[in-house]
């Protein structure tokens, strides 16, 4: 067994008995051929101990560790497993996910992973939304389309099955890092083993692509499905880990000092992780955002620490999504210099899913603030994205006196009947409703997913009395409704600007 040492949560010792990184063993045979899957070898390990390395979204790490490390300590006691977690900002290359290494019996590995998967599912869906993946691109020796056609018609592969992994959220995914030799066993001869795993579990199982020429030492297995489907698939994958004598050859949890390419965490695209997608540090992000005054709230990065993780997700997802859509951050009242605004746009563009990336980063800040007991000033609770009009009245005419939205957009704000949520009503000109809906309603759905708010638009022909404006009702937490209102308002003003520059454009 490896020597125990305190875990570091957000860079501070918590006294949790988690192992230190073992020496990084990087020497082992090249990837095993698929035929290895038919050879029943058993890796007995040390006293029946095996290793399972998984990725954990940074926003879910805090709930797994628990206050002062209590949750993870109790989990180790109950399962007999040893759990190691990379430091708070030591992410797997190309992601904002931390690496978790579990050591224990087969039963312990399954139990610990079941607990981790449950914690990830408990997080808000707007946080856990992952970047799209496609099953149409080859990632193993198996043709995924052919597998889809041969899957049995059963309760595990019917409507409840994630038949379209492109829409599968991170909450319904499992990501396991395995050595090449184990990957060969999981694939099997001609893809027979991975096909069998999918048929038996009902989940989709995809491996990061195998590169031509240079061999990666590890590959990432992505499992997509409902909780029970994923559980069965993980059990079958752990069986292959048990069979592989080399399954314990890559026990590092930090990739900071790993030289050479690393496997992509996604099953499609390049075989290699894109390290450019790694998020900036908290200090770098704070410098990027600047110390702006948002509706009278000073020092933006400092104020953020006073919000809960969910509020930060709603606020930051909204802002970062605007950047990813190409909105000019100089018009948003963030107090950014031209250089900083350009940098923010570049940072957003560098990520395949900028909204989720921002949410992860800010959720980490919230975790740090909670651990240190820091709070923002008394104005934090009254932070209002919707009132950014006061800060942006002089920017490119948006929200200025000439804008009809500045005077009459907000119809009212009240509490829901049970008092648990805010209800905000705004008026939107009939000819601009399409800008909010988007093609096939895509934009509206995306805004709801990103903010966590419910957005309803009055039916066609139902106007605010005395106007030709449709009523938009936003329901959710204060932060969610404000973020949704901000997204909608910015979308409308952007559309107005486009139409003003091009009078021939119609709604």
From Swiss-Prot:
Transmembrane segments in this chain: where? none
Q: Which UniProt keywords apply?
A: mRNA processing, mRNA splicing, Neurogenesis, Nucleus, Phosphoprotein, Repeat, RNA-binding
Q: Indicate the principal place this protein occupies in or around the cell.
A: nucleus
Q: Determine the domain of life of the protein's source.
A: Eukaryota
Q: In which tissues is it expressed?
A: Expressed in neurons of the cortex, sub-cortex, cerebellum and brainstem (at protein level). Expressed in motor neurons, but not in glia.
Which CDD domains is this protein grouped with? Answer: KH-I_NOVA_rpt1 (cd22435), KH-I_NOVA_rpt2 (cd22436), KH-I_NOVA_rpt3 (cd09031)
Q: What PROSITE patterns does the database record attribute to this sequence?
A: KH_TYPE_1
Keyword check for Cytoplasm: no
Question: Motif Bipartite nuclear localization signal in this chain: where?
Answer: 27-43
Q: Where is the KH domain?
A: 49-116, 171-237, 421-488
Stretches with biased composition (Low complexity): 150-169
The keyword Glycoprotein is annotated on this UniProt entry: no
**GO CC terms, sorted:** nucleolus; nucleoplasm; nucleus
The record's subcellular locations are:
Nucleus
Region feature (Required for RNA binding): 419-503
Disulphide bonds in the chain: none
Which disease?
Defects in Nova1 leads to neuronal death in spinal and brainstem neurons.
What's this protein's function? Functions to regulate alternative splicing in neurons by binding pre-mRNA in a sequence-specific manner to activate exon inclusion or exclusion. It binds specifically to the sequences 5'-YCAY-3' and regulates splicing in only a subset of regulated exons. Binding to an exonic 5'-YCAY-3' cluster changes the protein complexes assembled on pre-mRNA, blocking U1 snRNP binding and exon inclusion, whereas binding to an intronic 5'-YCAY-3' cluster enhances spliceosome assembly and exon inclusion.
User: What's the domain remark here?
Assistant: The KH domain consists of approximately 70 amino acids and includes a conserved hydrophobic core, an invariant Gly-X-X-Gly motif, and an additional variable segment. The third KH domain (KH3) binds a hairpin RNA loop containing the 5'-UCAY-3' motif on targeted molecules. RNA binding by KH3 requires residues C-terminal to the KH domain.
Q: What is this protein called?
A: RNA-binding protein Nova-1
> Which lineage?
Eukaryota, Metazoa, Chordata, Craniata, Vertebrata
């Amino acid at each position: 067994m490896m020597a125990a040492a305190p875990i570091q949560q957000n860079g501070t010792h918590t006294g949790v008995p988690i192992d230190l990184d073992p020496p990084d063993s990087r020497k082992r045979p090249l990837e095993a051929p698929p035929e290895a899957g038919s050879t029943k070898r058993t890796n007995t390990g040390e006293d029946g101990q095996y290793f399972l390395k998984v990725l954990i979204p940074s926003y879910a790490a805090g709930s797994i560790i628990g206050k002062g490390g209590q949750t993870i300590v109790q989990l180790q006691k109950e399962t007999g497993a040893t759990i190691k977690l990379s430091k708070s900002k030591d992410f797997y290359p190309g992601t904002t996910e931390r690496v978790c290494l579990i050591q224990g019996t087969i039963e312990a590995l399954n139990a610990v992973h079941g607990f981790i998967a449950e914690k990830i599912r408990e997080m808000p869906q707007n946080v856990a939304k992952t970047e799209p993946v496609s099953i149409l691109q080859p990632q193993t020796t198996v043709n995924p389309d052919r597998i889809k056609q041969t899957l049995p018609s059963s309760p595990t592969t019917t409507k409840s099955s994630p038949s379209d992994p492109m829409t599968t959220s991170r909450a319904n995914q499992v990501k396991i890092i395995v050595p090449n030799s184990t990957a060969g066993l999981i694939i099997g001869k001609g893809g027979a083993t991975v096909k069998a795993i999918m048929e038996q579990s009902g989940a989709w199982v995809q491996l990061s692509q195998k590169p031509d020429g240079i061999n990666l030492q590890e590959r990432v297995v992505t499992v997509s499905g409902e909780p029970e489907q994923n559980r069965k698939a993980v059990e079958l994958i752990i069986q292959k880990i048990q069979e592989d004598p080399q399954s314990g050859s890559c026990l590092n949890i930090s990739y900071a000092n790993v030289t050479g390419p690393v496997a992509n965490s996604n099953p499609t695209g390049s075989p290699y992780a894109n390290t450019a997608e790694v998020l900036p540090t908290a200090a770098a992000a704070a410098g990027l955002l600047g110390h702006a005054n948002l509706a009278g709230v000073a020092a933006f990065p400092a104020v953020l620490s006073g919000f809960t993780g969910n509020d930060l997700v709603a606020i930051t997802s909204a802002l970062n999504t605007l950047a990813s859509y190409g909105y000019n951050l100089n018009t948003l009242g963030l107090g950014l210099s031209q250089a900083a605004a350009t940098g923010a746009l570049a940072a957003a563009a560098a990520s395949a899913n900028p909204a989720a990336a921002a949410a992860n980063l800010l959720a980490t800040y919230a975790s740090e603030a909670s651990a240190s007991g820091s709070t923002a000033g008394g104005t934090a609770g009254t932070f209002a994205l919707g009132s950014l009009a006061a800060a942006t009245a002089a920017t490119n005419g948006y929200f200025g006196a000439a804008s009809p939205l500045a005077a009459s957009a907000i119809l009212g704000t009240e509490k829901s009947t049970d008092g648990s949520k805010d209800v905000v009503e705004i008026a939107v000109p009939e000819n601009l409703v399409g800008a909010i809906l988007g093609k096939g309603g895509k934009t509206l759905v995306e805004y709801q997913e990103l903010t966590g708010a419910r957005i309803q638009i009055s039916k066609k022909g139902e106007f605010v009395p005395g106007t030709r404006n449709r009523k938009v009702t936003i329901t959710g937490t204060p932060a969610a409704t404000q973020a949704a209102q901000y997204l909608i308002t910015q979308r409308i003003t952007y559309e107005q600007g486009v139409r003003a520059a091009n009078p021939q454009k119609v709604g």
